[in-house]
A protein has these predicted regions:
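Conserved, single-site charged/polar hotspot
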Residues: 1-305
Length: 305
């Protein structure tokens, strides 16, 4: 009953099989022991509404993979999460929750935009709405004056968002960059970790230095080796030669400074960007990949057995 509610029942068998193995592995990890049960029937765990939507294909996916789970280090993987769509790249769990070795960031060429409903999305907030939302979540920074992405990951997803208010400022990290915008009162939310604010700066903005984790956006006080072999200090932007192109360091997401009191967030994908993309699994299956290949692509270093 889980598979046809979590994934389109008419998708290729390999995608449905991958979903079945994910669901089975997920079920062995309890999420709600304090409430007296293991897993719930909603999107917080796995959607289950009985067998009404089951088909021969979804039943075959379950039967073909009977007893199989995803293993890491010889044990069932305890964080087999997935999302509807990653918007173009998965993310390292360390940049969203905490480090999980088999949940790593990688570009995803298998998601086909034209086949994904609401792949690209946008939502607009007023300064008053954001001020109220932040206050409800314990952040009293005064009237919101500015909001911007403070840091992107190497995959182009958001890892830090800064809110500047009339009294103070606050920077949130990880999954909070997405969830902090949720409001049932205003019926608004940010759908994924992959977005920009007011279109100021692309998700790929900035240059990653040395370890591919540190992004440089301001060059003031930075020392570099010039083409002439001299060490010089910079105070503005500069062009550098990367492995693939000439890029300008110092051009990242800049503060939005909304003139009309609104902030528009534009992004792609849906979910936390971790683990298997369900639409990506669909794309891989259509290209002839098996469910084992799909799972090993999205869960690095794991085995199915």
């Amino acid at each position: 009953g889980v598979v046809p509610y979590e994934m389109d029942k008419d998708w290729p068998l390999a995608a449905l099989e991958a979903q079945a193995v994910c669901a089975r592995t997920y079920a062995v990890k309890t999420r709600h022991p304090s409430l007296g049960f293991d897993v719930c029937a909603g999107t917080d765990c796995q959607v289950y509404y009985g067998r009404n939507r089951a088909t021969d294909m979804t039943d075959a996916a379950v039967d073909n993979t009977a007893g199989e789970m995803i293993y890491y280090g010889g044990k069932p993987a305890d964080t087999v999460v997935y999302c509807a769509s990653n918007g173009g790249a998965t993310e390292d769990a360390a940049n969203v929750w905490s480090s999980i070795p088999y949940l790593v960031g990688k570009k995803d060429p298998y998601e086909v935009k034209t086949n994904i409903p609401n792949y690209n999305w946008s939502v607009t907030y007023t300064a008053d709405e954001l001020t109220w939302i932040l206050e409800q979540k314990g952040y009293s920074i005064g009237t919101v004056k500015n909001v911007y992405v403070a840091e992107f990951t190497p995959m182009g997803n958001v890892s830090k968002v800064t809110f500047e208010g009339s009294r103070d400022s606050v920077t949130v990290k990880g999954e909070t960059c997405r969830t902090i915008f949720y409001s049932s009162t205003y019926n608004k939310s940010v759908k994924s970790q992959r977005f920009t604010i007011n279109g100021a700066g692309a998700a790929s903005g900035g240059i990653y230095i040395n370890d591919s984790n540190t992004v440089i956006r301001s060059l003031e006080g930075i020392s570099v080796l010039s083409g002439g072999g001299k060490t010089v200090r910079l105070d503005g932007s500069a062009s550098v030669l990367s492995a693939s192109e000439t890029s300008t360091v110092g051009e990242g997401q800049t503060p939005a400074f909304s003139k009309d009191g609104t902030f528009t967030i534009t992004g792609s994908g849906s979910g936390h960007n971790l683990g298997m993309s369900q639409y990506g699994a669909n794309g891989m299956a259509k290209e002839g990949n098996t469910y084992r290949e799909i799972l090993q692509h999205y869960y690095a270093g794991t085995a199915v057995g």
